[in-house]
Amino acid sequence: YEIVKVQPGSEQDMDTLRKLDRTLEQRLDYLKEPRGLRDSGYLLVNPGNLRRVKRFLAEHRLHFDAKPLYVPSTRKRRALQQNNPLNSNEILSNYLGYEDQMQFVDRIAAAHPNIVKIKTIINSTERRPIKMMQFGYPSTTGEAKPIIWIDAGIHSREWISYSVALFFIQQLAQNPKYLPALKLIDIVIVPNANPDGYEFSRHTNRLWRKTRSKHENDRCYGTDGNRNYPFNWGQAGVEWNPCSEIYPGPKTESEPEVVGLIREMTSQKDNIKVYISLHSFGQQILYPWGYKTHTYPLDVMDLKSVGMKMSDAIRQYGGTIYSVVNSADSLYAASGASDDWAKSIGIKYAYTIELSPSDMSQNNEGFVLDESQISRVCNEMLPALDVLINTTLSEFLGQSVSLSSILYPHFPSTYPLITNELIYPPTLCAVPEKKGLIGFSKTTRSISAILFFFRTFLCIQTASYHFNHSLHLDLLNHKLITRTNINPREEKPTTIPTNKFGMVKKG
């Protein structure tokens, strides 16, 4: 395989790419489509089409740059034995094979039976169990608890998604900060939603995306599991060629992997309040609807607000920027996706999270993220999980749990410090040493007082600027008030009347 980088400079170049797409037996596999003129696109070209694609681009005078696919070696690990337990740190340094993943979750469940239930929701096409883990203490009220649902790896080449899910599992089981929350809510994690495709990508084709089913009269294997859900199935962003990477299957729910996920989620749909599907790559938090551009749910502002809180939390941890965008507007319209379906059955907060990296700029990594990056990506996603937990607690139960004391153990000094909800940039807001002004003139003391007030005012305003939600501090012993800030590129934020000191006006 080679990665072919193209950068259309005119509409004629865009037409050339579309023409190339039509001339091949199967649609071009875009790792990243060009979103307009002078925006780079990256094609994954298999050996059988490589010479043809290069010749076509050269004949049409479209500049391209081709490089061999960079695939770093992954450390092999033999199957676990009872006397050779998996060190939890290995999930942050290795891409584990399916068998190791399942033995890891089995041992987590066995070690923490009071808060973890494990269940096989279905077997894959090749008879591999697809397991889900449900974290939470039994309800003390007899009523069902709100649920956060997270699944990973429906696209098998997106290896980092499996690692993040396993890291979440390890943290929920072993980090004591989560125990109070687990008394109030449940968290479900499906760490490997496409085990057949994953093992095929490990041993045969590193960039394999689909499942491994083969349907009658289909000459190629696999269906795109994220085009197989029963919501506007087959309407946009699909190809009916079974060899295509975005083949939606011969019918909706044709894949056992999708059937199992749908069946289990449907049985708990009244309690699931948050749905997350982990993917890569792009560093994006995507919200519905994805089946059509410029089409949004009625509560899109709530989706944006919580998405921005997740993005802010990730950025606070280590500086990584995740954009919060509509999936169809940002990428392309694609129907039959899991987040659209989840939203359609009444789950309020439904997102697809495209993990790191942001692009293909470093060694063409994209999906092939080096194992050295696993720890960084996993750790920076933990604050986003905490946002979802607090959102579920506050919105659906009227509760709150402090997670911040253990949330940022290695918080970078170059990023703002956290004190509850108010953010203080460290340099600007450092408390000055008291030296006194005895002996200075009245004018000097007055100027100093004005400068101190101005400094305090800037501190509060900069705190608001640093993060995409605004905080108004009532200096006369009133509560801290948070208001949502809408993406400035899309819509103007709803303003709250304030006086000249930044305080919320009464009435």
Regions flagged by a language model, labelled:
Residues Y1-L417, L422-P432, G436-S441, S446-A449, ...:
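M14 metallocarboxypeptidase catalytic domain recognition
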